[in-house]
A protein has these predicted regions:
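Short catalytic/ligand-gating loop segments at beta-alpha or beta-beta junctions
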Residues: 162-175, 198-199, 211-219
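A structural signal for well-ordered alpha-helical segments within the folded catalytic domains
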Residues: 2, 30, 90, 174-181, ...
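Solvent-exposed, acidic/polar segments of extracytosolic/periplasmic ligand-binding ectodomains
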Residues: 206-277
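Extracellular/periplasmic periplasmic-binding protein-like sensory domains
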Residues: 96-177, 188-193, 245-275
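Extracellular/periplasmic Venus flytrap/periplasmic-binding protein
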Residues: 1-99, 142, 146
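Cofactor-binding loop segments of dinucleotide-utilizing enzymes, especially the Rossmann-like FAD-
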Residues: 24, 111-113, 235
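Residue-level signal for short, function-critical loop segments
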Residues: 23-26, 135, 186
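Short, charged, surface-exposed loops that flank catalytic or proteolytic processing sites
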Residues: 16, 188-200
Length: 277
């Protein structure tokens, strides 16, 4: 989330000064926005320039919320960081269009809108808005061409509904692909499928991702170091990559922007085993 906000703050991203943090009411959006609010404070953004809103799962009436966003945006260059979940994204973007809020005026960056979510929906209200992922199908790289080809061949051979005629790849698929290949490498290194031996062998594993960039599993916490891409939604449901990190971002399981994480190292918390009876 932080790289996406840094992009929107930049000249290339529009130079946003005011922020709407809009999400579905559950733990991921609330934790993300807690981190983002603290990050924005560190950049000199005042609470008066941050508007935080939540809606229940399945929410579909965004008329009032979009009207509030439009009013808030009148106070200065505004961007929306969306952690809206699932089907609620469609009515939200539709209402933005109804209200005349265009991406060039109030850009929205989402963390749950990808190629699969855009399949079969009217993309007109979404064109120009943004999404942040570690992978997009449109990335130009030989490794990605090969990845898409493999999936296309498999989907057709297995007659997979929705993919046999129009195969799509997305971020969760890429993450699974990386994870499985790293696991296979670890099994080979360990010379065993024993869980503890494989876990130990996973530390430090590297793999060239479909993005063409080498991902690494952190030696201490087993989170991946991955690149971040910002993509602009196109009419065909694909993304035009407009920005990316210079390289993989180091895994950081304990955000320094949450006060209770102060002093925690980027490694797992060791919990003592319960005494045997």
């Amino acid at each position: 989330a932080i790289p996406a906000v840094e992009y929107l703050m930049s000249k290339a991203g529009g130079g946003a000064k005011r922020w709407v943090l809009l999400g579905t009411d559950y733990v991921y959006p609330r934790t993300t926005n807690k981190i983002l609010r603290a990050f924005l404070h560190s950049k000199g953004v005042k609470d008066s320039d941050i508007d935080e809103k939540y809606t229940p799962f399945g929410h579909s009436d965004y008329q009032t919320i979009v009207a509030d966003i439009k009013k808030f945006a009148a106070g200065g260059k505004t961007a929306v960081v969306s952690t809206i979940n699932g089907d609620s994204n469609v009515p939200f973007y539709k209402e933005l269009g109804n209200a005349g809020l265009k991406a060039k005026d109030v850009p929205v960056v989402a963390f749950s809108v990808g190629e699969e979510e855009l399949r079969g929906v009217d993309t007109k209200p979404l064109v120009g808005h943004l999404a942040a992922w570690n992978y997009f199908q449109s990335i130009k790289a030989p490794a990605n061409t090969e990845f898409i080809k493999k999936w296309s061949t498999y989907a057709k051979a297995k007659d997979i509904a929705g993919h046999k005629d129009k195969p799509l790849t997305n971020d969760p698929m890429e993450a699974t692909y990386i994870g499985f290949n790293m696991w296979a490498q670890a099994v080979k290194k360990a010379g065993s499928t024993d869980t503890d031996k494989v876990i130990a062998a996973m530390a430090g594993q590297t793999f060239t991702a479909p993005s063409g960039i080498t991902s690494k599993m952190d030696e201490k916490n087993h989170h991946l170091h991955k690149s971040v891409f910002i993509g602009e939604i196109k009419a065909d449901g694909q993304f035009n990559v407009v920005w990316k990190t210079p390289g993989p971002v180091k895994a950081q399981p304990w955000s320094p922007f949450i006060p209770e994480n102060k002093g925690k190292k980027d490694e797992p918390v060791v919990v003592a085993a319960a005494p045997k009876k």
